[in-house]
């Protein structure tokens, strides 16, 4: 099936806001596209009465509303809930829906923490850093090492550190990495932690911290040189040259969009 779909029903006057991606949708086609492309984000924050009411009131699809509401009352699986939405406009071929349903089943049979991590990792990949951090935090608040094993939570902390670092919150990133290292003594995690210290601490305090940790001089020098190299590289990046060709108004607007997307605001 192609990537373009003819708009078959009316456009909503009032959009439906999808919190996980901070976006408004106006048509059932847009809803279908979201469901198909973001299966890791489909949960009760989307599959609820509010969505059903929007489909009835804004799109005028009363029969579909009734069908979906019945699915909610029976507490059907996510796969069973979204099937009528796709069928309403024939958005997917039979094989496409079968493949999608298989993916959803594989997600649904996973423990809650793994499903949450899949969602958080997806948000991290698509630069929704604040929402990713929120999901990682929920996992850590309710953690039960007996269920998932300590390595799972070390991985959660590592990924959470990545989200913080993307927001330039290097102290928070360092804290996550130190917690992760306390769970699993990974050399890579330790090096990432030291990198964050070089970035977020004043030089004198960083030297003190390295002495406390008994970091070998050779490793300290290597890390400091690497961070300096990255800093210089960033300043001299090709992007700086590209930006010089773009009007300042466009640069500011682009940076605004990137910021709002990453903070989900």
Give a label for each model feature.
Residues 99-265:
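Extended amphipathic alpha-helical coiled-coil/heptad-repeat regions
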């Amino acid at each position: 099936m192609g990537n373009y779909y003819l708009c078959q029903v009316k456009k909503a006057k009032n959009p439906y806001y999808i919190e996980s991606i901070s976006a408004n949708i106006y048509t059932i086609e847009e809803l279908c596209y979201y469901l198909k492309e973001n299966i890791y984000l489909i949960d009760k924050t989307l599959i609820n009465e509010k969505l059903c009411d929007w489909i009835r009131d804004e799109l005028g699809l009363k029969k579909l509303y009734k069908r979906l509401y019945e699915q909610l009352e029976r507490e059907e699986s996510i796969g069973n809930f979204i099937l009528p939405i796709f069928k309403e406009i024939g958005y997917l071929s039979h094989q496409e829906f079968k493949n999608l349903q298989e993916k959803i089943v594989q997600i649904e049979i996973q423990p809650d923490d793994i499903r949450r991590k899949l969602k958080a990792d997806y948000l991290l990949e698509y630069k929704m850093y604040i929402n990713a951090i929120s999901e990682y935090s929920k996992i850590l608040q309710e953690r039960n090492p007996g269920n998932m094993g300590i390595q799972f939570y070390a991985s959660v902390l590592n990924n959470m550190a990545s989200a913080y670092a993307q927001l330039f919150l290097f102290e928070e990133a360092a804290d996550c990495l130190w917690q992760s290292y306390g769970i699993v003594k990974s050399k890579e995690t330790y090096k990432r932690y030291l990198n964050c210290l070089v970035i977020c601490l004043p030089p004198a305090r960083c030297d003190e911290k390295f002495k406390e940790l008994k970091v070998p001089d050779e490793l300290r020098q290597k890390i400091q040189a690497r961070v300096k190299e990255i800093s210089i590289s960033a300043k001299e990046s090709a992007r700086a040259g590209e930006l010089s060709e773009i009007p300042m108004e466009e640069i500011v607007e682009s940076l605004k969009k990137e910021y709002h997307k990453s903070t989900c605001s």
